[in-house]
Regions:
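Conserved P-loop/Walker A NTP-binding site and adjacent catalytic elements of P-loop NTPases
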Residues: 40-144
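Helicase-associated low-complexity/disordered flanking segments
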Residues: 1-55
Length: 144
């Protein structure tokens, strides 16, 4: 996992969002997901990301890989982009995050042109903390 960022001087606006609900990974885990403790391997991956280090996590299906980027996403300023080829997984995760109070969206081929444009507009306004993007969107001319 790689955290990409811009210096505040590179943009006209600064990210001024703060997180008043939780200040630690443990608080975020409890409030967002209802768990009292992390599964094996999750905390070390999260700590690496929060410290600004690269992290590579290989975990079996159902081991909680998503938590490894979702927790840092809500604790750190800015937007987290998640590249995922699985449309149904994107939809499920965005629904769960939105229900937990985390502003999330997805951009993939299931969106109408109107919904796509609205999602892009809101993303540019800084509405979302997490955006799931299908890989083919990254190669669409003009997307980035």
């Amino acid at each position: 996992m790689k955290i990409l960022s811009k210096n505040a001087s590179d943009t006209e606006t600064k990210d001024t969002r703060t997180n008043d609900k939780y200040h630690t990974p443990e608080q975020a885990l409890k409030i967002l997901f209802g768990y009292d403790s992390f599964r094996a391997g999750q905390k070390s991956v999260i700590d690496s990301i929060l410290a600004g280090r690269d992290a590579f996590a290989v975990m079996p299906t159902g081991a909680g890989k998503s938590v490894c980027y979702q927790i840092p996403a809500v604790l750190l300023p800015g937007i987290t982009l998640v590249i995922s080829p699985l449309i149904s997984l994107m939809q499920d995760q965005v629904k769960a995050l939105n229900e937990a109070g985390v502003q999330a969206a997805f951009i993939n081929s299931s969106l109408s042109e109107k919904d796509y444009n609205e999602t892009i507009r809101k993303a540019r306004q800084g509405t979302y903390k997490i955006i799931y993007i299908a890989p083919e969107r990254l190669v669409t001319e003009g997307f980035l």
